[in-house]
Amino acid sequence: MRRDVPQDSVRRNEQIRAREVRLIGAEGEQLGIISRNDAIALAKEKGLDLVEVAATADPPVCRVMDYGKYKYEQQKKKQEAKKRQTVVQIKEIKVRPKTDEHDYQTKLKHVRRFLEEGDRCKVTVFFRGREIVHKDRGLTILDRFVEDTKDLAKLDQEARAEGRTLQMMLAPIPKK
């Protein structure tokens, strides 16, 4: 790790390497291209820091500002962005082709709750033994789930067979 660049990779004051910089004042006004030392002196005179805003520009763009305040605002923006992120989980419900009505209703209630919470839901019909011959029963159950949740969900992934299972994915309809 290089010592002249701080952890957050924003150069300030003496860490700026360029001889000349395009300077932006504390209120956002353009001060033109001046030498780095003059810019640092100007910033120190105002009790502020010279912060490199755009290092790739030619000459680099630097701004006179309070570095501590700038760093604090960047941290707040990062926290706010992190807060707005939503983690979508995939919940799975497993049923069998011989699932009775009451059990189906219970599973349906769970699927509806998952979708209301904003999670995607994978519905899996798994077959045992010779049940695999009756894939049509599994497809009927999956179609019934789609029909019973059409007010909350859209079909995200069509029913597909994988080994001894039939699977489909339901995604919640975005709320307006």
From Swiss-Prot:
<dbReference type="Pfam" id="PF05198">
    <property type="entry name" value="IF3_N"/>
</dbReference>
<dbReference type="InterPro" id="IPR019815">
    <property type="entry name" value="Translation_initiation_fac_3_C"/>
</dbReference>
<keyword id="KW-0648">Protein biosynthesis</keyword>
<dbReference type="GO" id="GO:0003743">
    <property type="term" value="F:translation initiation factor activity"/>
</dbReference>
<dbReference type="GO" id="GO:0016020">
    <property type="term" value="C:membrane"/>
</dbReference>
<keyword id="KW-0396">Initiation factor</keyword>
<comment type="similarity">
    <text>Belongs to the IF-3 family.</text>
</comment>
<dbReference type="GO" id="GO:0032790">
    <property type="term" value="P:ribosome disassembly"/>
</dbReference>
<dbReference type="InterPro" id="IPR019813">
    <property type="entry name" value="Translation_initiation_fac3_CS"/>
</dbReference>
<protein>
    <recommendedName>
        <fullName>Translation initiation factor IF-3</fullName>
    </recommendedName>
</protein>
<comment type="subunit">
    <text>Monomer.</text>
</comment>
<comment type="function">
    <text>IF-3 binds to the 30S ribosomal subunit and shifts the equilibrium between 70S ribosomes and their 50S and 30S subunits in favor of the free subunits, thus enhancing the availability of 30S subunits on which protein synthesis initiation begins.</text>
</comment>
<dbReference type="InterPro" id="IPR036788">
    <property type="entry name" value="T_IF-3_C_sf"/>
</dbReference>
<dbReference type="InterPro" id="IPR001288">
    <property type="entry name" value="Translation_initiation_fac_3"/>
</dbReference>
<keyword id="KW-0963">Cytoplasm</keyword>
<dbReference type="GO" id="GO:0043022">
    <property type="term" value="F:ribosome binding"/>
</dbReference>
<dbReference type="Pfam" id="PF00707">
    <property type="entry name" value="IF3_C"/>
</dbReference>
<dbReference type="InterPro" id="IPR019814">
    <property type="entry name" value="Translation_initiation_fac_3_N"/>
</dbReference>
<dbReference type="InterPro" id="IPR036787">
    <property type="entry name" value="T_IF-3_N_sf"/>
</dbReference>
<dbReference type="GO" id="GO:0005829">
    <property type="term" value="C:cytosol"/>
</dbReference>
